[in-house]
A protein has these predicted regions:
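Acidic, glycine/proline-rich low-complexity segments that act as flexible tails and inter-domain linkers
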Residues: 2-126, 138-140, 144, 296-301, ...
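Residue-level signal for inorganic ion chemistry
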Residues: 76, 164, 220, 332, ...
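A generic, well-ordered mixed alpha/beta core segment in the N-terminal half of proteins
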Residues: 109-182
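Structural motif
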Residues: 112-115, 142-145, 162, 187-194, ...
Length: 376
């Protein structure tokens, strides 16, 4: 198998950096090499330096493969959080995730998927819409890739796996081959970190002990396991985070990107206020400000209470009823438009409305449940 450029970056240091450390000691251990990276990010205000893309890739490689010590890893994560990762550092981290993490490929002729990047530590304040949005898009033939894990620090919020399970669709416990086969046949893939990326899962305890989101949390918003052409939709909270995301993903070669100031940093669009997002094509961001009021979708965002209530409301929404139907119509309609399934925004909202009224989204859920019952 021919190695990809990302694999080369993740596995090799830049020539200059390699020469500088090897000349000092030809047999440096992983811990000794990691000291050089830690020394850069962990210095004082005047002397702290950003890592190069290659250095950042190697630093995360050493972390994921446990060649750095626990003390070094903890120090690096908190120092990097305080200083904030630079775009090229995030790109280097992406290189390593691409090299060491799971890989998902579309079938020949399959439509490009929409890959949603949301905080892995879940939601605690607002009712998630994205599982239902995914079902509406799937019912129109639009493939979807989601990623997440079990409950984790710092929020310990509700996860994608739990939400789908409450609807009767179990998406954990699958091998990557099974996930890819299901994706190619049904259009949906959930990359579940405990099953598919154990190296990254091993770092969860550091989040708990640090008590803050490390830079890995920013990385999770930018990474997708999908290889090939796709539309990447990434959530953000603060404008500086969005700017770093644009630059990092441009360096990483992402061609089609949407950044969303969504609910709790997710890709869910609020209906209580204007939706701020950017559509980045060929490296040029176009700011979009979308008003739910213009499409008859303005209302209060639905609060999160518990999984039982959410499941009931979610099934109602798939049948075009209940409090989640309005935010679902808004979210699904917007993403139908942005993914190219609709000619304009109004047409997208109309398509979403038609899917809900016809029961197409609920039928898609039923088909996925049948598929899962026949796997494994």
């Amino acid at each position: 198998m021919i190695a990809t450029p990302a694999q080369h970056v993740a596995e090799e240091l830049s020539v200059e950096f390699r020469q500088s450390i090897v000349s000092a000691c030809p047999e440096l251990s992983g811990r000794e090499r990691f000291k050089a990276h830690l020394g850069k990010v962990g210095s004082g205000v005047e002397t702290s330096q950003g890592l190069s893309r290659e250095e950042s890739a190697e630093a995360l490689n050493l972390i994921l493969t446990a060649q750095a010590s626990p003390a070094q890893i903890g120090a690096f994560l908190i120092a990097h959080r305080i200083r904030r990762p630079e775009p090229q550092e995030l790109t280097g981290m992406l290189d390593t995730y691409r090299a060491l993490g799971p890989q998902l490929k579309s079938a020949i002729g399959q439509k490009r998927p929409v890959c949603f990047g949301m905080p892995f530590d879940g939601r605690t304040r607002t009712a998630p819409i994205y599982p239902l949005t995914a079902l509406v898009l799937l019912s129109t033939g639009q493939p979807i890739v989601l990623q997440g894990g079990r409950r984790m620090p710092v929020k310990y919020g509700i996860t994608a796996e739990e939400l789908f399970k409450s609807l009767g669709l179990e998406l954990k416990g699958l091998t990557m081959d099974q996930v890819e086969a299901g994706f190619n046949n049904n259009g949906l893939a959930l990359i579940y970190q405990p099953d598919h990326f154990p190296l990254a899962e091993s770092l969860i305890s550091y989040r708990d002990e640090i008590g803050k989101r490390p830079p890995l949390a920013s990385l999770e918003l930018l990474w997708t396991a999908h290889q090939g052409e796709h539309l990447l939709v990434s959530g953000f909270v603060h404008p500086p985070t969005e700017n770093r995301a644009w630059k990092a993903l441009e360096l990483a070669g992402e061609k089609s990107l949407i950044t969303v100031k969504g609910l709790e940093g997710s890709t869910d669009l609020p209906i209580s206020r204007a939706c701020v997002m950017s559509w980045v094509q060929a490296g040029q961001p176009e700011r979009l400000v979308l008003h739910p009021r213009d499409h008859g979708c303005f209302d209060q965002d639905i609060e999160w209470n518990n999984i039982e209530q959410w499941s009931k409301q979610a099934l109602e929404a798939l049948n075009n009823r209940g409090p989640l139907s309005q935010p679902l119509r808004w979210n699904a309609g917007t993403y139908l438009w942005l993914s190219g399934q609709a000619d304009n925004h109004a047409d997208g909202v109309d398509q979403a409305d038609a899917c809900l009224k016809s029961g197409a989204a609920k039928a898609t859920l039923d088909q996925l449940i049948i598929w899962r019952s026949n796997v494994g």
